[in-house]
């Protein structure tokens, strides 16, 4: 793992908030919340961890944090981000097409809230979701059953009950199976549960409050007490703070600037709920004032992209040319856009959050940049170079016993990974398992298109391998006419532990030994690990694609269209394998005879 947790934790706030763990490609692995961010994040990097957490931590390349005022706000934001970004470690690596739903039948007089693996095409009810995970569905179902006493039994059980079950005894069901509740009253509970699941719990609370007052005036104190308990449970659930105000769409921009860099944080609020923060590190090449820089950034942010413009844009500073910017935004949006920097109430709280997040992100980025500069300088000194390199490239090969061989090229400059310059190469025409030939093909394809004067030529080319790979890399550069690029080979030690690598320079007889605490070695390990992860991710995608399609491709009569329909209908090849003949025949374009053919081909 190349992520420097010790260094990162020095920059983290003790405030409550939400954190996002990212992999080498910038994909969100996990979203979590914490009452104290620093303590929670530190717990991932000390002590015994379970297998799942160890697997997660091993893939971390970056952690982004968003500060909130309270833990409740962090919880609300966490759920928003999980539903929006669907990180794999929050959803237990579920396939994209099989996110769970909550289903409410419109055919049953007393419908249950049902767990469904996927949305069915027939219109026999209402689907709520999708939810980010099975756990999220089950927790939501449990909560709605507890508050509104919705039944959770199967229809077949419901039809044959003659007395209430245990769920009624523990006040988690109103026993509609034995007519302890009328159809109209039960439907009202269902409607309230649906409204809560759709995020309209405030409307439910208001209605229940009116019902409670009516019951009290009618001297029905038992009903009033029941409604009071429901209201209290809902209010404990809500605890609405500034992250979920229930009012307004707005984007909020704040700028933090210090010697060495600046950060602009953009908070998006929709329907009163904060959807998250994005951080930008623009270059102030013209040395503009903060007001002018923020104005130019906002203009480019909206007018330079096809982006939704909310009714209100709030800024921490009065913008230069604010009237012009407001007019342009209004014209682009086709409605009047309010541009404000002096705000009160929850808008002022939003703004303070944006300012806090900008400061926090800038602190982290400047610390990272300083550390990276030390690593580049250390590598320069270790390799005895006259100048500090400005660009590194590293290659790695990944395959499974020669299957689906993929080469990766990752790029670092003095600000860190340059992910827009990353490349993958699907290797073809080489013997299975021949890593030398695969590396030669990847290097040739990469550098034959570059000229000696190209600004994207690396100062140092790193290959994951020993003497053989280094020799081959030198031959490729000579063949394509590239000079001036230094070569570095990284051979894993016998135990394959970090810090025990053998490094080879330029010629195979020139080895380099670096202390395990060397910042230069840490840089090499970082880019090597990044190349490895980028390669293995591409390899797995390629391998899975080949395996997924080849199984169905071998079945007579199954072309690309039917193959797509099968995979879409069942959420993947595993679902197709588990389907019965009758279930296969329900797929559009699959006849009963074809279903039998598919079933026999998959099961023999």
Curated annotation (Swiss-Prot):
Domain of life the protein comes from: Bacteria
Report the residue ranges that make up the UVR domain in this protein: 202-237
Molecular-function GO terms, alphabetical: DNA binding; excinuclease ABC activity
Instruction: Give the GIY-YIG domain ranges.
Output: 14-91
- What Gene Ontology biological process does one annotation of this record name? SOS response
* SMART domains tied to this protein: GIYc, HhH1
Task: Spell out the residue ranges making up region: Disordered.
Answer: 538-557
Q: What Pfam family is a match, any one?
A: UVR
User: Gene3D superfamilies per the record?
Assistant: 5' to 3' exonuclease, C-terminal subdomain, GIY-YIG endonuclease, UVR domain, UvrC, RNAse H endonuclease domain
Q: Give UniProt keywords alphabetically.
A: Cytoplasm, DNA damage, DNA excision, DNA repair, Excision nuclease, SOS response
Q: Which GO terms describe its cellular component?
A: cytoplasm; excinuclease repair complex
Where it sits in the cell: the answer is: Cytoplasm
Q: How does it assemble?
A: Interacts with UvrB in an incision complex.
Give the protein's biological function.
Answer: The UvrABC repair system catalyzes the recognition and processing of DNA lesions. UvrC both incises the 5' and 3' sides of the lesion. The N-terminal half is responsible for the 3' incision and the C-terminal half is responsible for the 5' incision.
Q: Which HAMAP family match?
A: UvrC (MF_00203)
Family the UniProt entry places it in: Belongs to the UvrC family.
Protein's UniProt name: UvrABC system protein C
Species assigned in the record:
Chromohalobacter salexigens (strain ATCC BAA-138 / DSM 3043 / CIP 106854 / NCIMB 13768 / 1H11)
